[in-house]
From Swiss-Prot:
GO terms for biological process: ATP synthesis coupled electron transport. Residues 46-59 are mitochondrial matrix. Its cofactor is Cu cation. Cu cation A2 binds at residues 196, 198, 200, 204. This is Cytochrome c oxidase subunit 2. It comes from Uromys caudimaculatus. The keyword Nucleus does not apply. Keywords: Copper, Electron transport, Magnesium, Membrane, Metal-binding, Mitochondrion, Mitochondrion inner membrane, Respiratory chain, Translocase, Transmembrane, Transmembrane helix, Transport. Mg(2+) binds at residue 198.
Amino acid sequence: MAYPFQLGLQDATSPIMEELTNFHDHTLMIVFLISSLVLYIISLMLTTKLTHTSTMDAQEVETIWTILPAAILVLIALPSLRILYMMDEINNPVLTVKTMGHQWYWSYEYTDYEDLCFDSYMIPTNELKPGDLRLLEVDNRVVLPMELPIRMLISSEDVLHSWAVPSLGLKTDAIPGRLNQATVTSNRPGLFYGQCSEICGANHSFMPIVLEMVPLKHFENWSASMV
């Protein structure tokens, strides 16, 4: 999860988030190189007296500044398209969880189980225990098995919401009348926090998401106790 004065991204917990972090670094390096080149050219223009005010055209320069931006765009587009494909591809999920957004809470349904569903509300500040996180704790966590592909079906009962867990690289809009899907795969156990990321009304900031990733055996015991 995020911590005060954090400058970088949250620690990656899923393969998708690892790819997104690498792509961020890749793109940032390209932006840094372009910015350095532009600043260098500007500094030369300001400090040198060797200018060509009478030059009408320069085929070599025009060729370079046409081909170079195109090549840079390709270097950005190819890994981006690859990650977009990975985010949309779901291969043999072991579990499907349906998530519905409401004003202002989330409800979850494990479609592979009978009668395994619950609502998840934020715990008010005056009911928090020592060590709990303000505006992030919920009364019912979403318990999922780690290291396995899980399909999340996401929609809304009323207005636009967005189901987002940054450390897993997840952000999927919850749209009334439409069913969107996302893949969840965690590399390690733990608690992972998110929030509604679409302005949805007065209590928009009071819709936290808590995923509890556990080993498969623990998940089976939990699901058996809930059914």
